[in-house]
Amino acid sequence: MNRQQDFIKELSAVTRRVCLYFPETIAPVEEAFLWNVSLTPEQTDEYLAQGWRHVSWYFYRNNCSKCRRCLPIRVPVDQFKPSKSQRRVLKKNMETEFKMFEPVEFALKHIKQSLSLYNRFLDVRYKKAPRDLGEYYNEYFVSPAQTLVSVLFINGKLAGNGFLDLGKTSLSTIYFAFDPQFSSFSPGTFSILKEIEWARENGLRYYYLGYYIREIGAMCYKGLIRPFELLDFKTGRWKETESNLGEDTTRNTRPKTKRGFG
């Protein structure tokens, strides 16, 4: 097993807390803080393959032995083919500009616009209090892994941006937010499609979407990015899945995506 995975495990502790996704449940969460650590691309691949997620320096992994409802999901980018509805999203966004930025470059050019967009997204989607510039920067622009920022411009305006980890063979979405006025363009779906396309063009193998949780409608869009693989924490192996989960769990959910943590 890769030494870096052992290193994260060695620094981690199991904390029992109210589950973020199922508040009626007290769940054990593996947590670690990787202060002042720089991960190599290979180490990033490894932590993703082992089911870890992170926000800034904080790494976490839901691994409840009696639950198994929070399953890491990834897409083999060479096998992905957009569905009919996803092709319609691409057609609708023919004039939408998609770019990838290094975090520093993006911050210098767009961080104030990005923060304003992010706070509108939090308010409309979740009724959450706004973040200040320092909180926003520390949460998304500081990372032990190499990070990229995916950006959408519609009619010259910043319409959405997402933060991603880049490994040697992997691209992993951390968080995506968009300006609610552009909801009709399906920016969450469009950004996923373009990020997968970028991953394929750059020779990557996997695109990680965080957790797939069958019972949470806001996460069911992940089951529509097919084919996908789910991590079995019990065996430590990724299992290929074609379409049944996506069809069964998304049929009655709203088409709008709510991309965020998880």
PLM region spans:
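Glycine-rich loops and low-complexity Gly/Arg-rich segments
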Residues: 98-99, 128-129, 187-190, 197-200, ...
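Short linear sequence elements within intrinsically disordered, low-complexity coil regions
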Residues: 26, 123-126, 243
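A conserved beta-strand-loop-helix scaffold within acyl/acetyltransferase catalytic domains
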Residues: 58-67, 72-184, 224
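Intrinsically disordered, low-complexity, positively biased terminal segments
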Residues: 1-85, 262
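Acyl-donor binding region in acyl/amide transferases
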Residues: 16, 23-49, 54, 113, ...
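Short, basic, helix/turn surface patches
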Residues: 80-92, 196, 232-240
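Active-site/acyl-donor-binding loops of N-acyltransferases
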Residues: 71-78, 206-262
